């Protein structure tokens, strides 16, 4: 390959030629897009993006650099990163590094100087699909062979890969004693729970219902996370056993696992919801709320049991954004 050049090859054969960005190497993942103009550091470190190559639709990325505070986990979680153009000289009083240096240091492969609008439209029209970025190999046949071996996101349990392996306490003070199940939990979610007077103990994804009952929390929180919710069988079974015994609140993957435990079904969205301005209608109040979202699967509204109420709807595609079963505090 030419010096500093890179290629993105999609599973359907579409290719994009650009420049290397970050670490020199090769990476495979599901190619998706995020429509946020800011928040790239949070996106890079969000465990929900495990095994995904993220495309930023905003054309200029890295303006305010990288700092030590705006992380959602202890490391970069994405498999790769795609942008139109990198900011070479970031400007912010908290900035400690450029985004390119940050990716290089953490050995994350990226590509820039491609038509990200065309890529986004291709994903929008054809759906999220696997792709490979390489700054080492430009042979299409070779890259295609590697790509065909990559698993589909359907049926993939990734929660166990990103979850904590040990129980730990996030906050020791608070009125409400909460057990948070870590399927890929973000730091900001833990901070928000703590800010709302919750004493939080974080448990691994494969924690059993017996362990939660023994801990005896006042409520159980099911976190966000990557992969197919239907593949997290251990999580679904754990929630089934807790239904009616403890108040349960789920977000993102946790919301989907909770819905599956209640008897609903989930399905893969064509290209997912990833951005910071998704309109969601609160069906109780009629108010439209602007939300930040990051998920590739959704709950099938038609599969909800009769006793489960749909409380929130995504107005972009009329998919489920919230459910409630008030009789057992769900």
Report the location of each language-model feature.
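RNA-binding accessory domains that recognize and position tRNA/RNA substrates
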Residues: 1-210, 214-215, 229
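Conserved beta-strand segments of alpha/beta enzyme cores
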Residues: 109, 199-201, 265, 290, ...
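Hydrophobic residues at beta-strand termini and immediately following loops
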Residues: 181, 203, 269, 313, ...
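Cysteine-nucleophile active-site neighborhood
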Residues: 218-219, 224-290, 296-301
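Short, Gly/Ser/Thr-enriched beta-strand-loop segments that form substrate-interacting elements
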Residues: 307-315
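Short, surface-exposed beta-strand/loop micro-motifs that present aromatic residues
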Residues: 319-325
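Conserved small/polar residues in nucleotide/adenosyl-binding loops
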Residues: 328-330
């Amino acid at each position: 390959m030419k010096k500093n050049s890179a290629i993105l090859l999609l599973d359907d054969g579409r290719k994009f030629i650009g420049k290397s960005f970050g670490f020199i190497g090769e990476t495979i993942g599901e190619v998706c897009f995020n429509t946020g103009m800011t928040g790239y550091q949070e996106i890079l470190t969000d465990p929900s993006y495990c095994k995904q190559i993220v495309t930023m639709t905003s054309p200029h990325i890295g303006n305010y650099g990288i700092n030590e505070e705006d992380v959602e986990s202890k490391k970069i979680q994405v498999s790769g990163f795609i942008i139109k153009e990198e900011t070479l000289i970031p400007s912010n009083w908290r900035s400690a590094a450029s985004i390119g240096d940050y990716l290089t240091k953490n050995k994350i492969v990226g590509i820039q100087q491609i038509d990200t609008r065309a890529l986004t439209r291709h994903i929008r029209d054809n759906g999220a699909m696997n792709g490979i970025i390489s700054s080492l190999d430009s042979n299409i046949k070779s890259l295609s062979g590697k790509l065909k071996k990559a698993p589909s996101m359907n049926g993939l349990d990734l929660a166990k890969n990103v979850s904590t392996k040990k129980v730990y306490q996030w906050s020791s003070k608070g009125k409400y004693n909460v057990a948070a199940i870590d399927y890929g939990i973000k730091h900001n979610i833990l901070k928000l729970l703590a800010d709302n007077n919750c004493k939080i103990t974080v448990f691994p994804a494969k924690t059993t219902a017996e362990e939660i009952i023994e801990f005896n929390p006042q409520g159980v929180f099911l976190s966000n996370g990557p992969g197919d919710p239907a593949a997290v069988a251990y999580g679904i079974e754990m929630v089934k056993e807790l239904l009616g015994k403890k108040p349960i609140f789920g977000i993102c993957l946790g919301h989907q696992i909770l819905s599956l435990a209640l008897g609903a079904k989930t399905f893969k969205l064509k290209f997912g919801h990833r951005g910071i301005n998704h309109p969601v209608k609160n069906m109780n109040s009629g108010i439209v709320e602007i939300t930040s979202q990051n998920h590739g699967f959704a709950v099938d509204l038609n599969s909800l049991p009769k006793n489960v109420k749909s409380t929130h709807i995504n107005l972009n595609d009329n998919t489920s954004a919230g459910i409630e079963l008030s009789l057992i505090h769900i």
